[in-house]
Amino acid sequence: MNFTNTSKLLAAALCLATSYSYADSERPLFSLTMTESGVQQTNNDGSLAGATKSESRILPIWGDAARAKGYDLPEPFGASYSYMNLRQDIVVDSIKFEFTNPIFKPWEKQTIVNAGKTREKSETHMLKLDSWVLPFLNVYGVYGKTKGTSKTNLDTVYAPGAYEPWKNLPFELNFKGKTFGGGITLAGGYNQFFATLDTNYTRTNLDILDGDISALVITPRVGYEFVFEPLLAGQGNTKVQVWVGAMYQDITQRFKGNVSNLDLPPELALFDMIKKQTDIKFDVEQHLAHKWNNTLGARIEVTRNFNILSEVGFGNRNSFFISGEFRF
């Protein structure tokens, strides 16, 4: 049995096993509602209009008082479906291994992996339920599924008994999991200008890791609302909101798991021989290459009960987000 090659391959596999970072969240898992509460409603010429017809509701609290002052409040409850595509760079700081069989314990210090560039791509499908508790405060919960791919080029891999390190080893890792969490959105405006601040926290269970991945995402936005003639008769003015913003992500930086859960490439065929003699755990520390990126988005309120939203991220992180929402 060639332990040298096997050790190299194991190191390569484990390095990429933890190159995943969610928030990619997602969400990730981000502010899906941009209906601006606290923005005075206007006609299509920009003049202040009377309150849109809306019966008195339990929520939002103080909603009747806000409507009496001429503010246009969205329907209090919402349900939406969204899709997000995210691409970002990951920096792997360290990779360690643990062998349960005492015979292989010396390998823990002798196996050294230096990871190069790591690029992650992920797709997330998300369901969201929300409510405007106050005219300026939205509270929501999210649940969804994520799948993706992480690609890494391992600069060098040092293995026990090896005469030379293994260099420039490409590796691709596929992952999938479920995400759940919640958040709040603060919103306000002046005339047709508005601002929102969304904060959410999520946890993701991946099939290749032990435990959860936690993610904190904060997204400030500022924008302007355009008002047009109704697209559908009797449904009120059609509104189009455009905005610019930024997204901050803080993701769990340490991941652990079992090598046996990884979908290893054909080059790691010798791994099966090791797997029969010992369990091998990986422990990886990493961080996002960039925590902030820019965003640009738009939302079309087709009727008071249905809207479509889309947002793109650019700069240090690339993302595309789209959702459809029903309000009632």
Task: State what each model feature region is.
Residues M1-R57:
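Cleavable N-terminal export/targeting peptides
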Residues D24-E26, R67-E75, S131-F136, G189-A195, ...:
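Short loop/turn motifs that connect adjacent beta-strands in outer-membrane beta-barrel proteins
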Residues G70, Y81, L127-P135, G141, ...:
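Residues on the lipid-exposed face of transmembrane beta-strands in outer-membrane beta-barrel proteins
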Residues E75, K121-H125, N174-F180, D212-I218, ...:
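Residues that define the transmembrane beta-barrel architecture of outer-membrane proteins
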Residues E75-S82, V139-G141, F193-L197, I218-P220, ...:
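Transmembrane beta-strands of outer-membrane beta-barrel proteins
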Residues Y83-D89, Y143-T149, G188-Q192, T199-N205, ...:
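Transmembrane beta-strands of outer-membrane beta-barrel pores
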Residues V91-E98, K151-Y158, L206-D212, R254-N261, ...:
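Outer-membrane beta-barrel translocator domains and adjoining extracellular loop/strand segments
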Residues Q241-F328:
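Outer membrane beta-barrel transmembrane domains
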